[in-house]
């Protein structure tokens, strides 16, 4: 049995990435303050349909995701269908895979096309760190349920007497892993220490990311893949990412204090991604349907793979596990790739994965391979800057990476590109795209 992955439908047609778009990415509580993930999702899907001149009624499936869930609209995908002029019978469901969420939605739509169930679908994701589901304490939640059953004033008074002042305080969403209590920042700190990644190297990678992202915006390359977002009540707009450090100076990074290990740490706010708001989406079609409708795809999915590892140690090493699987399924080696796009959750996590790509010991002990994945050529790596600069709305990053690498490959005359990311819960993803 061949190890090669056949990302085609029954007719042998490839899965075409027809178009992609995202909102600008904005730091928490700035341009998108008060705008929900759902509203950003509707915003970007509406604009994507308008720009592609695709009749919304032709969309057969929409798979969308978010990580920070909205209790009022748990199925964000269905709400987007109902809010963007698509046929009400359009299949729609929501997914979540932490920072790999829109990779998952992309794969789900692609697999629906591969099985022949649909020919056209939309995938993507959105997240807001500014509109959060603020909860209540367990004691208050328990009391509120009991209040619904209490009949007399005396019974209600007895319930209130069980509560202390601290029980009334709001509870923000958790930033730590449910199973370990560790935050991703703490894991990044652990990886920096385990693999001897210096503060200087982390700051240098962050500086590189911001510098390249700033140059990319100045070149105009992102104008066709980032929409102008008009913010309700439509008196303001945002037309570019607002986390990028223009005229980044390497020496300035050293001024920041460690964020997670105050005494001995090296992970800072400057070499980590900030909490970010934003949304992204892509249109997928069977190759034949895209051709029939007159579209020139920006790329095709060649292979993909997901991975899962332990959450106590090296939780953010997902790219090092998923990438060799995707390469094997594509029949490729790392050196065959034209471009490599790795999600930069933290500089420490990114550098640790790059180190493991080149490690024979890691390949033998963790992957069961007799040779390393390969040493990354920096002339191919995150050439437009990465998440450290652009920001990271959790569910939106995957389809940002896919669109960005496809369009950059198109500018370069074609080739193949790897997109890969770590995700909370010890998850990882890698997807290889090809562009003609």
From Swiss-Prot:
Root EC class: transferase
EC number: 2.3.1.16
Keyword Cytoplasm found: yes
CDD domains: thiolase (cd00751)
Recorded metabolic or biological pathway in which this protein acts: Lipid metabolism; fatty acid beta-oxidation
GO molecular function: acetyl-CoA C-acyltransferase activity
One cellular component term from this protein's GO annotations in UniProt: cytosol
HAMAP family named among the record's database cross-references: FadI
Entry function: Catalyzes the final step of fatty acid oxidation in which acetyl-CoA is released and the CoA ester of a fatty acid two carbons shorter is formed.
Protein name as catalogued: 3-ketoacyl-CoA thiolase
């Amino acid at each position: 049995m061949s190890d090669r992955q056949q990302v085609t439908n029954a007719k042998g047609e490839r899965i075409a990435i027809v178009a992609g778009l995202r909102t600008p990415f904005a730091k928490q509580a700035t341009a998108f303050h008060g705008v929900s993930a759902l509203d950003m999702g509707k915003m970007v899907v509406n604009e994507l349909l308008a720009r592609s001149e695709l009749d919304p009624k032709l969309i057969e499936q929409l798979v969308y995701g978010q990580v920070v869930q909205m209790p009022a609209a748990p199925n964000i995908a269905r709400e987007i269908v109902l809010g963007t002029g698509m046929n009400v019978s359009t299949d729609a469901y929501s997914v979540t895979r932490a920072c790999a969420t829109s990779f998952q939605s992309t794969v789900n739509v692609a697999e629906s096309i591969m099985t022949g169930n649909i020919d056209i679908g939309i995938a993507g994701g959105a997240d807001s760190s500014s509109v959060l589901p603020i909860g209540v304490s367990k004691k208050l939640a328990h009391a509120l349920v009991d209040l619904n059953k209490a009949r007399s004033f005396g019974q209600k008074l007895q319930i209130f007497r069980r509560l202390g002042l601290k029980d009334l305080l709001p509870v923000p969403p958790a930033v730590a892993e449910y199973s370990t209590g560790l935050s991703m920042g703490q894991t990044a700190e652990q990886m920096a220490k385990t693999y001897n990644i210096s503060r200087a190297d982390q700051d240098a990678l962050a500086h590189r990311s911001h510098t390249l992202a700033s140059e990319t915006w100045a070149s105009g390359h992102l104008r066709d893949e980032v929409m102008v977002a008009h913010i309700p009540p439509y008196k303001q707009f945002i037309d570019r990412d607002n986390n990028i450090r223009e005229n980044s100076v390497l020496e300035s990074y050293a001024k920041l204090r460690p964020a997670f290990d105050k005494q001995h740490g090296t992970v800072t706010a400057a070499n980590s991604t900030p909490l970010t708001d934003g949304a992204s989406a892509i249109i997928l079609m069977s190759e034949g349907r895209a051709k029939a409708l007159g579209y020139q795809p920006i790329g095709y999915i060649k292979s993909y793979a997901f991975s899962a590892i332990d959450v106590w140690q090296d939780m953010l090493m997902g790219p090092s596990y998923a990438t060799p699987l995707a390469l094997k399924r594509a029949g490729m080696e790392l050196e065959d790739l034209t471009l490599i796009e790795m999600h930069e959750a933290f500089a420490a996590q990114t550098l640790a994965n790059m180190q493991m790509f080149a490690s024979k010991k890691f390949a033998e002990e963790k992957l069961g391979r007799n040779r390393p994945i390969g040493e990354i050529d920096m002339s191919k790596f995150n050439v437009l800057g990465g998440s450290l600069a652009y920001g990271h709305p959790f569910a939106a990053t995957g389809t940002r990476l896919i669109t960005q690498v496809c369009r950059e490959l198109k500018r370069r005359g074609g080739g193949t590109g790897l997109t890969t990311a770590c995700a909370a819960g010890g998850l990882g993803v890698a997807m290889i795209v090809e562009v003609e």
